[in-house]
Structures are given as C-alpha cells and as structure tokens.
Amino acid sequence: PLYLGCIVGRYANRIANGQFLLNGKLVKLTQNDNGNHLHGGQKGFSSKLWDVVEHKTNTLILSLESRDQDENYPGTLKTTVSYTINDLNELKVGFHAYSDMDTIINLTQHSYFNLNGNTGEDILNHKIKIDSNQITEIDHQLIPTGKFLDVKGTPLDLRKFTRIGKMINQNFQQINFAKGYDLSLIHI
C-alpha cells in the first residue's frame, strides 16, 4: 500500500519478522509486509480517524488513542500531532506521545509537496536540503540493520541545497536497496 499524506505509526519503517524484544520479553506484532511489520501494521495510524483537538488560522492539532494490544503493541498510547505554519511560512510538524506501559514508538508523516509549482514535471529538478548527518542502514529487504551510516561524501549528503536528479541515480547501495530516497535520514 501507499502511505500518501498520512501520519505513520505506531512504528514507522519495518520490523524484521514482526517481532522485537522489550524488557527481555518477545513481542510479536502483526505481519503485513512479506513476514515483516511495516508502518504500524494492517491497521496502523495511517488508517485511523484522528480527532481534531484544535483548529486555528495557522495551527491544526490532532489526537489519537491507540489501545493496549492494538496491532499487538503493548500499552495504551496517546498521541498528538501539531501542524503549524509560522511567520516565516515554514511548516512545523510536532509529535507528542505518552504510553502507560513500556513500548516502542517511531512516528513520522508522509506529506508530499510539489516544490516548484509545475504539476506536469517530475521531482528530479527539485532542490532539497535536509539537516541530516546520518541514515539508518538497511539491508536488501529494507530492514534496518541497527547501524548508522555517515552521509558525508555520499549521494545522501543533502545538508546543502541539492538537485534531486543529481544524486538519486548514483550507484550507491542504500539508494539501490530503497529504489530512491526511501530511507531514514537522521540528525545526531
């Protein structure tokens, strides 16, 4: 499935074999991606109806309560997401979550924007800048390995404005595995 324009959770990305250890106990999640768990499972946050908590001219705040054992995750998780456009015309997205039990969480949002205003053109001439100095390494099945890779000197070094088409077609293992920039870019 495509995850276009949605909030992704409880856990964005893949969890190998749909299971993980938490406090020494094996937690088995639903499997929805070739035996793995992807983006919160079959009924992840992307398929939920969020409640509007606040709606102002420049701010929207949404909330969702995910009950204990939802997609087999431990703990009831209360989450809010805020979207704010500030005076500099920047979109700020903020996540806040609280669980009543130890659990795992990795939230993201999959909003997409046309950066140059031409809907008939692909993204290769778009310029992007991402304040990220590392990525989470993935294997050929797109499963995170637990390692972090430095982006310096790679096609994933997007810390300065870069035309997407300049880097995305380079022969680089992580881009090849993901078939593009479908990677977790992080700043540590």
What function would you assign to each model-found segment?
Residues 23-25, 100, 131:
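Short strand-coil-strand connectors
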Residues 162-178:
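Contiguous C-terminal substrate-recognition/catalytic subdomains in enzyme active sites
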Residues 26, 32-88:
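Extended, loop-rich substrate-binding clefts of extracytoplasmic carbohydrate-active enzymes
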Residues 68-117:
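Acidic, contiguous internal or C-terminal segments within carbohydrate-active enzymes
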Residues 1-45, 143-157, 177:
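Active-site loop/turn microenvironments that scaffold catalytic and metal-binding pockets
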Residues 121-162:
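A conserved active-site cap/scaffold subdomain adjacent to cofactor or substrate pockets
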Residues 186-188:
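Conserved small/polar residues in nucleotide/adenosyl-binding loops
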